[in-house]
Amino acid sequence: MNDLRVEVAVGDRMLEQWRYVHNVIVPPDELSADEVRERSGRNRLENVYLGDELVGCSTVRPPGAEDGVATVIARVLPEYRGRGIGAALYEHCLAHARGLGARHIQTVVLAANGDGVRFAEARGFVEVERYVAPEDENEVWLTLRLGA
């Protein structure tokens, strides 16, 4: 997959691309442009391209000072899944999180996203928490930790 490219989302155009992918994959947690800009100040947001085509995005939340837990989230648009893009993106994000000094890695997945849950479990993530979003009692989220 030589034409796969991961770029840090900087500037309005790239942040809007990141927001598009996020909102397609996580519609219950749709983000505004302002929310994405705020997140970009505290997390590493990246876009993934296959050639010139936007195919996914990622988030790496830096490890907490006390617990050393970093959060890695890889998102691939449905029409591009099953091609190894998610695996390559995940490995890229994992390396970045470890480079930040993460002692533990976790991910967060909407429980209704069966593809995302299976992807995480296939890579050794284990569910450690299940919670309901405060604004929508039908929105169940999973926190999964690598090698928990």
Residue ranges, per PLM feature:
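Conserved catalytic-core motifs of GNAT/GCN5-like acyltransferases
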Residues: 106-110, 121-143
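A short, internal acetyl-CoA/4′-phosphopantetheine-binding micro-motif in the GNAT/acyltransferase core
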Residues: 73-81, 109-110
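Short amphipathic alpha-helix that is part of the acyltransferase structural core
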Residues: 1-33, 140-148
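Conserved GNAT acetyl-CoA-binding A-motif
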Residues: 97-111
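Conserved beta-strand in the GNAT
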Residues: 47, 53-62, 68-75
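Short loop/turn motifs at secondary-structure junctions and domain boundaries
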Residues: 36-41
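Conserved acetyl-CoA-binding loop-helix of GNAT-fold acetyltransferases
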Residues: 82-95, 99, 118-122
